[in-house]
Amino acid sequence: GAWQQIPEISKAVHDAGAMLLVDTVTALGGIPVEVDAWNIDAIYSGTQKCLSCPPGLSPTSFSPRAMDVIMNRKTKVQSWYLDVSMLANYWGQNRVYHHTGPINMTWGLYEALCLIHEEGLENCFARHLRNHRALKAGLAAIGIKYSAQEGHQLPMLNAVYVPFAVQNL
């Protein structure tokens, strides 16, 4: 549960000529995620965490640079189902039927995003932080410590040390 400094990591990755992939399965909807400002090439999430939607979808985004690499790869993707270049053709003139979309999940995500919009992003972020602080205070009261350093704890992923006395129960 450590909050990573993505802007600094992004700069180092791009300075080295590489591309940046970011996992926001837990974070999306719980803290600010600035895909374009942080120069993220590929990012993915899950709907079942801070988006408060049933599991089953993985929102993704690719930068133009990442899409260029995807569309011009030299080797064939071994899994037809995971071939992003075929998925990208849904929006082009060479549309290829890839699979039946999970319409019920898409509507579920739409409704979850509507609820976040109604609450307001800043209020949503503040709610997750309040809940984190309340949990942290309760855990501290019974002697449980966080694994991430103070100031680097991700509010929605609370990784803690298991007390030695209960490790073998």
Residue ranges, per PLM feature:
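Conserved active-site segment immediately N-terminal to the catalytic lysine
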Residues: 36-48, 58
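General beta-strand structural signal in soluble alpha/beta enzymes
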Residues: 20-24, 43-46, 53
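General structural feature for long, well-ordered alpha-helical segments within catalytic domains
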Residues: 2-5, 31, 39, 105-108, ...
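Short, well-ordered, mixed-charge alpha-helical segments that flank or form enzyme active sites
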Residues: 1-3, 28-32, 37, 51-54, ...
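Active-site C-terminal subdomain of aminotransferase-like
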Residues: 48-137, 141
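Catalytic PLP-binding core of fold-type I/II PLP enzymes
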Residues: 3-35
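Conserved PLP-binding catalytic core of the aspartate aminotransferase-like
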Residues: 145-169
